[in-house]
Every structure is written in structure tokens, then in C-alpha cells.
Amino acid sequence: DDPYNPYKYSDDNPYYNYYXXXERPRPGSRYRPGYGTGYFQYGLPDLVPDPYYIQASTYVQKMSMYNLRCAAEENCLASTAYRADVRDYDHRVLLRFPQRVKNQGTSDFLPSRPRYSWEWHSCHQHYHSMDEFSHYDLLDASTQRRVAEGHKASFCLEDTSCDYGYHRRFACTAHTQGLSPGCYDTYNADIDCQWIDITDVKPGNYILKVSVNPSYLVPESDYSNNVVRCEIRYTGHHAYASGCTISPY
């Protein structure tokens, strides 16, 4: 996979494997450790979720089942949402939060599933290349027991943005999914399934636990920075997040 190969250019993603002539490394120049070097090619990715991004934009929202049809198809709701007596005008209470994951490793993070098995989601009109990119759980603050039915979030992996000096190479398409070193995959809180269904949760103090690559399906150089834990105070109408930190468990 040569990033300078012009035949890899894609109209679906003009940034894929594309470098402007002015930004392309000059022959004979000193390369930093990165793409195209032995250090990079034999390295490993390292995913790190952003705790401050989650803390800044966590909130509670009520939505009708009518507006949650796509999410219901992707099993993003608690089991009580699938009872036979649930109607379109019934509401669910959702704890929404964003997620931004950086690959700070030295190699691409590539989907665990081969391309031919990526799953097409007709509601959202894109392919999901991983069934378990993230786990979302809500735990009791004192007992650490799970109080809400968190779900396994499948993702469409792409380079949403990159640090200065790095370039986007992957997009949410049928053939270019992944996360490059120095780049971020970002999901805002208003996207479907960026939530935990807390309809059946009582007001109280909880822990929001967000894990990336939770089943270690993709090898990484460091698994100890894959979890964010946040303190959540839920009043029954509002949620307040604080103390979000990277956690080893």
C-alpha cells in the first residue's frame, strides 16, 4: 500500500493516499519515523480515546421510538425497547456523548474483518468494518455493577482529521476504512447510537465507561490506554459528566 501510488487515488475520498506536491517529502530529505519507514512498517497502532471530548458534550435526550427506527435495527437500545407493546410514540431516554479516538501508534489501525465481510447498514448508508470497535457501559458508582444495557458499537472507520504534518488516507467507504497514525476518528454526540439507553435507570451517581478495541481483536502496542471512565451525576432529567480520565480497566 504505497501512499504515493497515483492509481490508489479515489474520487470517493480525494485525501486517500494523496499528498500535495509541495508537502511530499523531498528525495534525500530526513524522514521522520512514519509511513514508508521500517520503523513504521513493523510497528503497531495504539488507539487512545479522548476523555475531555467526552466530558465536554455529554447530555440526556428523550426520543420517540419513531425516530429511533434505524438505531433499533442496529440494536442500540435496551431490551425493553423491543417489547411487543412498544409503540412509535413511546419515548426512550438516552445518555448521549461524543467519541474521538486517536491512533498515536506507528502503524495503521485496520479493521479486524476482511473487506468482503463488511456489513452494509441501509439505514445509515455506509459499511461497518468492525462489529466491536467500542463498548459503552454505565456502572453503579459504588458497586461497579452494570446498571444499563450498554451496547457494542460497530463503526465505519475513517481519518476524520489529523495532526499537522499527517494526512488523511482512510474514508468511510467500501474499500478504504482504517485509522492512520497521527489521525482521529470522531463521532459527535448527535450521531445515531452514540449513547447508552438509560430509560430504566434511576437518578444517582454512575460511571460511564467507554472502551475502544475492547476485545483486542486488532493488535496494539499498548492496551492500557483504551478505556475512559467518567463520573456521571444523573438527576432524572439531566446528566453531568466530570473527572473523565484514561483508565487501564
Curated annotation (Swiss-Prot):
EC number: 1.4.3.13
Catalytic activity, reaction form: L-lysyl-[protein] + O2 + H2O = (S)-2-amino-6-oxohexanoyl-[protein] + H2O2 + NH4(+)
Names of required cofactors: Cu cation; lysine tyrosylquinone residue
2',4',5'-topaquinone PTM positions: Y187
Xref: Pfam families: Lysyl_oxidase (PF01186)
Residue span of region Lysyl-oxidase like: 45-249
Subcellular location(s) per record: Secreted; Secreted, Extracellular space
Posttranslational mods: The lysine tyrosylquinone cross-link (LTQ) is generated by condensation of the epsilon-amino group of a lysine with a topaquinone produced by oxidation of tyrosine. Proteolytically cleaved by BMP1 which removes the propeptide. Also proteolytically cleaved by ADAMTS2 and ADAMTS14, but not by ADAMTS3, at an additional cleavage site downstream of the BMP1 cleavage site. The propeptide plays a role in directing the deposition of this enzyme to elastic fibers, via interaction with tropoelastin. Cleavage by BMP1 to remove the propeptide does not increase enzymatic activity but increases binding to collagen. Cleavage by ADAMTS2 produces a form with reduced collagen-binding activity.
Domain of life: Eukaryota
Disulfide bonds listed in the record: C70-C76, C123-C172, C156-C162, C183-C193, C230-C244
Per UniProt, location of the Lysine tyrosylquinone (Lys-Tyr) cross-link in this chain: K152-Y187
GO molecular function: collagen binding; copper ion binding; protein-lysine 6-oxidase activity
In-chain residues carrying the UniProt-annotated modification Sulfotyrosine: Y19
Annotated binding of Cu cation, by residue: H124, H126, H128
The entry's keywords: Copper, Disulfide bond, LTQ, Metal-binding, Oxidoreductase, Secreted, Sulfation, TPQ
Keyword Secreted attached: yes
Listed PANTHER family: LYSYL OXIDASE-LIKE-RELATED, PROTEIN-LYSINE 6-OXIDASE
Function: Responsible for the post-translational oxidative deamination of peptidyl lysine residues in precursors to fibrous collagen and elastin. Regulator of Ras expression. May play a role in tumor suppression. Plays a role in the aortic wall architecture.
Subunit structure: Interacts with MFAP4. Interacts (via propeptide) with EFEMP2; this interaction is strong and facilitates formation of ternary complexes with ELN during elastic fiber assembly; this interaction limits interaction of EFEMP2 with FBLN5.
Name recorded for this polypeptide: Protein-lysine 6-oxidase
